[in-house]
Design a protein with these regions (language model features):
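Conserved RNAP core-binding helix
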Residues: 30-47, 152
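Arg/Lys-rich amphipathic alpha helix in sigma70-family domain 2
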Residues: 62-84, 109, 168, 172
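A short, charge-rich alpha-helical start-of-domain segment used by transcription regulators
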Residues: 1-21, 31-34
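Short, Lys/Arg-enriched C-terminal cap helix and immediately downstream tail that follows
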Residues: 73, 163-182
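Sigma70-family region 2
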Residues: 39-56, 74-76
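A short pre-motif secondary-structure segment
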Residues: 130-134
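DNA-recognition helix of helix-turn-helix
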Residues: 142, 148-172
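Internal acidic/polar
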Residues: 70, 79-109, 113, 140, ...
Length: 182
């Protein structure tokens, strides 16, 4: 048991931030994300001796995703937040973005973070999920296919559509500003 625990701590726990990030983007709630990650980590630890794939990160994120889907099935459809930014508190802005010695840079970074959160929050769950896994967590297409239990071609098409949709939301939110995408 001690060897398994040590292996789990060395191989799975370094991906705790990625697990939380995915849960946060799926649930749009800090509290729900924490609950999902707690459930997922318990399940992951109980089944860690069966983990055979090359990527512990992808395996753990698949468990997080499945824990989220199980939670949705148990509690039924959740009320959607009309404005994802309203649902987010100041804790959602990374401290590094708001703590430099340059207040102007801090304001621009905080505004960019809000725009990013808003654009991602407006994407359908399937698009948001693959975009977060690829662009924020750095998973390969194959790993994303494993996490989402979808064919790699579906991952690629969802990712392409997610990028288009994200860009459209980003440009609408930043119309007239100098920091939009080109």
């Amino acid at each position: 048991m001690t060897d398994l625990r040590t292996r789990f701590e060395q191989e799975a726990l370094p991906h705790l931030d990625a697990a939380y990030n995915l849960a946060r983007w799926l649930t749009r709630s800090d509290t729900e994300a924490e609950d999902i990650v707690q459930d997922a980590l318990l399940l992951a630890f109980r089944n860690f001796d069966r983990q055979r794939g090359p990527s512990t990160k992808a395996w753990l994120l698949a468990i997080v995703r499945n824990a989220f889907l199980s939670s949705v099935r148990r509690s039924g459809p959740r009320a959607r937040v009309s404005d994802p930014i309203e649902a987010m508190g100041e804790a959602d802005t990374p401290p590094a973005l708001v703590s430099s010695a340059d207040p102007e840079r801090d304001a621009i970074a905080a505004d960019s973070a809000r725009s990013l959160n808003e654009a991602l929050g407006k994407l359908p769950q399937d698009f948001r999920e693959v975009l977060v896994l690829r662009e924020l967590e750095g998973l390969s297409y194959r790993e994303i296919a494993g996490v989402t239990a979808t064919p790699i071609g579906t991952v690629m098409s969802r990712l392409a559509r997610a990028r288009e949709s994200f860009k459209a939301h980003w440009l609408r939110a930043n119309r007239g500003s100098d920091d939009g995408l080109s």
